[in-house]
Regions:
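A conserved pocket-lining segment of Rossmann-fold NAD(P)-dependent short-chain dehydrogenase/reductase
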Residues: 170-192, 196, 200-211, 216
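Flexible, glycine-rich beta-alpha linker
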Residues: 127-129, 150-169, 188, 223
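Mid/C-terminal beta-alpha module of Rossmann-like enzyme folds, strongest
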Residues: 203-269, 280-316
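N-terminal Rossmann NAD(P)H-binding glycine-rich loop of SDR-like oxidoreductase domains
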Residues: 4-26
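Conserved Rossmann-fold NAD(P)-dependent oxidoreductase catalytic core, especially the SDR/UDP-sugar
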Residues: 82, 90-145, 150-152
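Rossmann-fold NAD(P)-dependent oxidoreductase module
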Residues: 16, 20, 106, 141, ...
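NAD(P)H-binding glycine-rich loop region in Rossmannoid oxidoreductase-like domains
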Residues: 47-102, 106, 121-125
Length: 316
């Protein structure tokens, strides 16, 4: 039995990863920032699995909390990340990059060598974007750490509790018969179900041959943004016209909302990302891990229900 520290255990990916690890007879140490986050972890798990979970309070932003969190641990799966901020990228760098560096330093000091890191597809080519810069630099820090690392780089994730698809669903709910898409709606994505990512994370942990490798992961089909929006409408049973809107216009509205601290579905940095392709090898999951991930068609029924608010460890 491997004892695995999971950072971001209370977030979207963590909520699917913990049952995957526990079902394979691993013991989990869930790193949580607060008692509230810990309660969220335990509420989601069936009673028969709780005995194999230990909650430890800590935060990658607070290096002094990481050494106690690593005590008795064999490996780490690092999920913590944020996808937006309103500080010109400073918070993204603080959490995504500095938090990863803090974890690496703590692992080096404690002697825990095995690290599976959740990266993001396409960020190496997008360092002009705040999110891309923070994630690309974090991935480089992992690769240069001297630890026994594996990096998984997924495209958009879907599944109960997700960020992106629920945002599109909210736009559909709020729209008066039309749904805006940024630009021409032709940017391409390769949506991957979060449960399939969780399986890839577990298999990475268990297979020594994955050490020293980074894997680009996506679903079995490429979708344009416009096609994704249409599929969300179908899943929700809503008829909507899909209308392209120039990215500069949406950025203007988003920037104005950010300036006065009004809620807006996406930040300006995220809008720039949505106008760019986010695809990898179409058989990336099968080539690396030996299974075919599920298709998105028919899997979005959860969008009929409004999601609960996610915490700051959410990977959007």
């Amino acid at each position: 039995m491997t004892t695995v520290l999971v950072t971001g255990a209370s977030g979207f990916v963590g909520s699917h990863l913990l049952p995957e690890l526990l079902g394979a007879d691993h013991r989990v140490v869930a790193l949580v920032r607060s008692a509230e986050a810990g309660a969220k972890v335990t509420r989601r798990l069936p009673a028969e699995l709780l005995a194999k979970v230990e909650l430890r309070t800590g935060d990658v932003d607070r290096p002094a909390t990481l050494a106690p969190a690593l005590d008795g641990v064999d490996a780490v799966i690092h999920l913590v990340a944020i996808a937006r901020d309103s500080s010109g990228g400073r918070q993204l760098l603080a959490v995504n990059l500095d938090g990863t560096r803090n974890l690496i330093a703590a692992m080096q000091a404690s002697g825990v060598r095995r690290l599976v890191h959740l990266g993001a597809l396409g960020v190496a080519d997008r360092e002009e974007l705040h999110y891309g810069k923070s994630k690309a630099r974090a991935e480089r820090a992992v690769a240069e750490s001297g630890l026994d690392w594996t990096i998984l780089k997924p495209s958009l994730l879907f599944g109960p509790g997700d960020g992106f698809f629920n945002i599109v669903a909210d736009l559909v709910r709020l729209s008066p018969g039309i749904v805006p898409v940024p630009g021409d709606g032709k940017s391409r994505f390769q949506p991957l179900h979060v449960a399939d990512l969780a399986l890839c994370l577990r298999l990475s942990l268990e297979r020594p041959e994955t050490v020293g490798h980074a894997y680009e992961l996506g679903g079995p089909r490429t979708w344009t943004y416009r096609q994704i929006t249409a599929e969300v409408c179908r899943a929700m049973g809503r008829r909507r016209a899909i209308v392209p809107v120039p990215v500069p216009l949406i950025k203007l509205v988003a920037g104005a909302a950010e300036a006065v601290h009004l809620p807006f579905p996406v930040a300006t940095d995220q809008l720039r990302q949505l106008a760019l392709d986010n695809v990898g090898p179409i058989d990336g999951v099968h080539a690396a891990f030996g299974f075919v991930p599920r298709r998105m068609e028919g899997e979005l029924r959860y969008l009929r229900r409004r999601r609960a608010q996610q915490g700051p460890t959410e990977v959007a």
